[in-house]
């Protein structure tokens, strides 16, 4: 399985979904997953599967002794694994820039030379595919499709690509031709395509001209909260109500609609504060918009948050809002609902297909969004109902069930 990020080092929902999905799959006794990421940090959860870092896979032979390898990468990889991979280098990659172990360095992020890293990752995938014993190749999102294709060419094994988003979602239609080409190439080479929602499935079929018979919607789920998160004290109940937006502050997420709706709410009640948690290329623009609307004293920008910090924000919030213009799925409302926070989501989000106990509005309908915000902070009975029923609903949406659906697709491909 190829991915680009994995907890605790994540920049969005892709890593969170990768973790939940792999854990759900591994609940099946006869399922073993090897998960490949560009750069491991050593603190990933390896309790249920094997993790390989592309930055520890040699593509050029280096004659190095065991102790040296252990000293260099022993915190993230067993030296024996390094030698096993080294024995399966299949071509002369001496023209590539490699380090003292014959490995390519990866940033583990989304650098300016992203397409170069994607290409390098696909080279490493070939070595891994020649070394590992496996039945299926599963590639998460466009960044890993080239790696999946190369692994398929090397091994002859079936390729499943998992669409967490398309460039039509990320760009509001202003599609990057290079990204589109990478995505379409992945879809064309895939034996099956999984999409995180029916809306994404339709996009893949219509915009990328794929056979509907090989495209399936497999909705995401949510990971049960661990005791450390459950122990975070509930900070609601002070005088002011808190309404939160949490996510990348980018065009796709619709942050400007949150600000405009907040302005309308404050025309009717002053006992509300707004949090915009996250970072992104529209953050400065949103700070200026808040100042222009004269609501800076009611607005808080926290910057990027991760891990426990995210749940501390949920536990301090009365309402969660996700006004995304295009959201293939959207795990964050499910996480908020786990903390008993009623959620308002856009009808243009994939999670709207499976959630009954969330308020749904069109992303562009600022009046409807403001009405929903106002209602949830003004009517305790409505707030209590959605808090209780929403919690029950998300507790029934399990990654284990997603794993069973994915297993059925695997079995179909292998039969």
Language-model-detected regions and their locations in the chain:
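Conserved acidic donor-binding segment of nucleotide-sugar-dependent glycosyltransferases
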Residues: 358-367, 375-380
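A conserved catalytic-core segment of Leloir-type glycosyltransferases
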Residues: 31-129
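Conserved donor-binding/catalytic core segment of Leloir-type glycosyltransferases
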Residues: 194, 237-262, 275, 387
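Nucleotide-activated donor-binding/catalytic signature segment of Leloir-type glycosyltransferases, i.e.
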Residues: 285-305
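Aromatic "clamp/platform" in nucleotide-sugar-dependent glycosyltransferases that forms part
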Residues: 325
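Short alpha-helical donor nucleotide-sugar binding micro-motif in glycosyltransferases
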Residues: 304-305, 312-317
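Carbohydrate-associated surface elements
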Residues: 199, 221
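Short hydrophobic beta-strand element within catalytic cores of glycosyltransferases
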Residues: 342-345
């Amino acid at each position: 399985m190829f991915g680009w990020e994995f907890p605790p080092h994540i920049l969005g929902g892709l890593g969170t979904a990768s973790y939940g999905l792999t854990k759900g799959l591994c609940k099946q006794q006869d399922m073993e997953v090897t998960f490949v990421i560009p750069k491991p940090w050593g603190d990933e959860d390896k309790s249920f599967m094997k993790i390989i870092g592309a930055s520890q896979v040699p593509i050029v032979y280096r004659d190095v002794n065991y102790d040296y390898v252990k000293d260099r990468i022993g915190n993230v990889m067993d030296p024996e694994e390094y030698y096993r991979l080294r024995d399966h280098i299949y071509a002369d990659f001496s023209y590539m820039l490699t380090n003292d172990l014959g490995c390519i360095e990866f940033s583990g992020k989304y650098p300016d030379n992203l397409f170069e890293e994607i290409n390098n990752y696909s080279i490493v995938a070939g070595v891994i595919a020649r070394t590992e014993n496996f039945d299926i190749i599963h590639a998460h999102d466009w960044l890993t499709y080239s790696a999946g294709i190369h692994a398929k060419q090397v091994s002859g094994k079936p390729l499943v690509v998992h669409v967490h988003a398309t460039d039509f979602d990320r760009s509001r239609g202003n599609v990057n031709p290079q990204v589109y080409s990478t995505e379409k190439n992945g879809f064309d080479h895939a034996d099956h395509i999984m999409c995180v929602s029916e809306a994404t499935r339709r996009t893949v079929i219509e915009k990328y001209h794929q056979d509907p018979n090989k495209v399936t919607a497999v909705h995401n789920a949510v990971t049960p909260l661990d005791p450390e998160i459950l122990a975070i004290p509930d900070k609601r109940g002070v005088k002011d109500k808190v309404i939160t937006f949490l996510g990348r502050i980018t065009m796709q997420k619709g942050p400007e609609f949150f600000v405009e709706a907040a302005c309308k709410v404050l025309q009717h009640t002053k006992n509300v504060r707004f949090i915009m948690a996250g970072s992104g290329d529209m953050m400065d623009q949103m700070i200026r918009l808040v100042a222009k609307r004269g609501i800076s004293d009611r607005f808080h920008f926290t910057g990027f948050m991760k891990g426990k910090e995210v749940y501390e924000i949920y536990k301090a919030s009365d309402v969660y809002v996700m006004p995304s213009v295009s959201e293939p799925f959207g795990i964050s409302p499910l996480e908020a609902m786990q903390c008993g926070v009623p959620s308002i989501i856009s009808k243009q989000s994939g999670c709207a297909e499976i959630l009954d106990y969330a308020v749904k509005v069109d992303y562009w309908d600022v009046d409807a969004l403001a009405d929903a915000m106002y209602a949830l902070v003004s009517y305790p009975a409505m707030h209590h109902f959605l808090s209780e029923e929403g919690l029950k609903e998300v507790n029934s949406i399990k990654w284990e069930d997603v794993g069973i659906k994915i297993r059925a697709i695997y079995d179909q491909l292998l039969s």
